[in-house]
Amino acid sequence: MQSCRVQCALTLLSLALAINSISAAPTDPRLRQFLQKSLASAGKQELAKYFLAELLSEPSQTDNEALESDDLPRGAEQDEVRLELERSANSSPALAPRERKAGCKNFFWKTFTSC
């Protein structure tokens, strides 16, 4: 019984030392700097999308009379603003799909394809 306790204590002590030595291992500062830069650029874009999603999910404030319009019904205006925000969040100039008219033809590698 005594040897089992001693063996368990030694095992836990060795595991604690192994974990401590792994976490205290030196890291390359260039690698850390590269990872921070890449995460910062991706993080800003993800953070902006997150905040935009939060804004879209919040119910509109009916207390604010400055935003109310007499021209459009309240629901239609909210839908229009929401669609515009979603389009601006999801669109990027390099990846925006081309809008084509119905029935147009596209010449691709010696053949015509419909759009």
From Swiss-Prot:
Disulfide bonds join 104-115. Residues 60-79 are annotated as: Disordered. One of its GO terms (molecular function) is hormone activity. One of its GO terms (cellular component) is extracellular space. One of its GO terms (biological process) is regulation of cell migration. It is found in: Secreted. The keyword Cell cycle does not apply. The keyword Secreted applies. Keywords: Cleavage on pair of basic residues, Disulfide bond, Hormone, Secreted, Signal. Residues 25-99 form a propeptide. Residues 1-24 form the signal peptide. It comes from the Eukaryota. Belongs to the somatostatin family. Somatostatin inhibits the release of somatotropin. This is Somatostatin-1. It comes from Pelophylax ridibundus. The lineage of its organism: Eukaryota, Metazoa, Chordata, Craniata, Vertebrata. The gene is sst1.
